[in-house]
Design a protein with these regions (language model features):
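Beta-propeller blade termini and top-face loops
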Residues: 1-177
Length: 177
């Protein structure tokens, strides 16, 4: 077995996001860097991997997030953690996956575990990295650390409560905040 990769096989689904805007529209990410899209509930799938930069095509897709506001918009984060790549990779599509724009330009050089869009405000995004949570209020153009007493720990999941404006952060070893 490859000592760097271990014995975990590739082609494992790591993340699934169903569009809240359109029935049957699903985004799927895998541990071998592929992002898949179906518009008919799984009848036909399109591999979108070649629409991303070469450098992320072999990385783990850590999260796909279907927009709460537009069926053509989605967000994808990749992590290079298992490859010891300490860069942030977050992308947005506004054309149903035809093209992807990096929105990670001013995030710190840390693997990204999760990206979430606020369900009430399309311009507000959150990312959880290996060390922190960051927020953007301009659709990913600029990012700032969230702060608010959060521990310096890997944020593995984020949830925006649907009825209250609370962000829940699931961390590695530091509980839920």
């Amino acid at each position: 077995a490859d000592k760097k990769r271990g014995d975990v096989p590739h082609c494992t689904i790591t993340t699934i996001a169903e569009s809240p805007r359109r029935e049957g529209l699903l985004w799927v990410g895998t541990d071998d860097g592929k992002v898949w899209l179906t518009k008919d509930g799984g009848g036909r799938w399109t591999d979108l991997a070649d629409r991303f930069p070469e450098e992320v095509r072999r990385l783990w897709v850590s999260r796909v997030e279907a927009s709460h506001h537009d069926e053509q918009t989605a967000f994808v984060s990749f992590t290079g953690y298992r490859e010891d790549i300490r860069s942030a990779y977050v992308f947005r599509t506004d054309d149903g996956g035809e093209s992807w724009l990096s929105i990670a330009h001013d995030l710190p050089a840390e693997p990204v575990n999760v990206v979430r869009q606020h369900p009430r405000n399309a311009n507000v995004l959150f990312v959880g990295t290996e060390m922190d949570v960051h927020v953007s209020i301009d659709d990913g153009a600029h990012w700032a650390p969230l702060g608010d007493g959060l521990p310096r720990a890997a944020a593995h999941d984020l949830l925006i409560h649907p009825r209250h404006p609370h962000l829940l952060v699931g961390t590695h070893g530091r509980g839920i905040w």
